[in-house]
Amino acid sequence: MTYEQIDGLISFVSNSPGQPTGYGQQGAMLVERMVRHGINVAALSNYGLEGVAGELEFAGKKIPHYPRGFKQYSDDVIQPWHEDFVGQNPGVPDAVFTLYDVWVYNDVPPRNDFPTKFISWVPLDHQSLPPAVAKWLLRPNVTPITMSPHGQRQLEAAGIASTYIPHAIDTKVFKPRETMSDGVNAREYLGVKPDEFLVGVVSANKANGLIHRKAYSELVLAWSIFLKSYPKSKLYIHTEPSGIMGGFDLPVLLQACGVPHESVIFPERDRLRKGYSQEDMAALYSAFDVLANPSYGEGFGVPAVEAQACGTRVICSGWAASADLVAEDGLLLQGVPFWDEPQKAWWSIPLVDSIFNALVEAYKAERGPSKVAREFASQFDAERVWKWGWLPFLREFFK
């Protein structure tokens, strides 16, 4: 197949494309298509393969991979790495593309010292716009791309123009699947009986040691209450259970809430560390009767879309990006405002009774794959999003 070619150069600043993180997976899908359409791409890593100065392969071509810098978010090396890449490809229209929280880039030299254009695919996970985020997006050489309708509305209210292009998934992979890649039935793999109600959670256990954006404490407390009335239920939490990455010690939290250890399942630690394949994740999503994804605020929330593509209904927060990412048969939570002092903006905390009520409603609902959820998730197919979103945007940007 012959693809339209775009004459452009992009330094892609994010997690290393292809790594088993949300940004890594989004980066891989996007970089693959950029390279396919003739754009020169270099990966500027802030996580994943951060020590590697070498090459990655996408669309049958080698692209350079630059290592991280000395600062936490590698913003100290954006300018030198980009200028190095541009120097190897003189005369090509260029840009730096960021897929990360943009407040970390406010120390990047201003346009007078670093005149390169920036494209920032920005997560907006608060109910009000953080000033540090607005500061970056208001730079005259920054073009914002919002990944949710919520984000676009939020920027519009602040007088900041943006283009909406959502995160994407591969719907050829994320679809109803009964078995893992080794042929084992997913529910059997988890040790869940056919008549048991299975709630799944796919949320990173990363926090600042005090506040957990993924609302694990509220979810676990709600689960402890739910389990008393519906004991034939299991909770699968697809995350690292210890607090080793700055998150919560989930076994201690579960014990503090009186949750029997046999009602909770965690993934195999070594397998989790290496990363479950997307096919195996699709099988796990398909095994869930519902995905519980409460949060103080989401910039997007890929697991909710992946689960729905597999026919699994979801429970999500009814604010920030999540509110626009739930099908009609999904469930939205209520919350109370919470001030995020470091970001100077509002989140919301999901109410425990709202999570409990959503679990009960999901328990009483019809089981099995949801056609409504699958149809809703189809709009986020990677090739569809590329054709209606990224391709026309990049064509116009580099013309």
Q: Locations of the language-model features?
A:
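Nucleotide-activated donor-binding/catalytic signature segment of Leloir-type glycosyltransferases, i.e.
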Residues: 247-283
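Short hydrophobic beta-strand element within catalytic cores of glycosyltransferases
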Residues: 304, 313-316, 326, 331
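Conserved donor-binding/catalytic core segment of Leloir-type glycosyltransferases
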Residues: 11, 193-214, 220-223, 235-237
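Carbohydrate-associated surface elements
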Residues: 150, 168
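A charged, aromatic-enriched C-terminal amphipathic alpha-helix characteristic of glycosyltransferases
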Residues: 350, 364-394
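A short helix/loop element that forms part of the nucleotide-sugar donor recognition site in Leloir-type
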Residues: 175-192
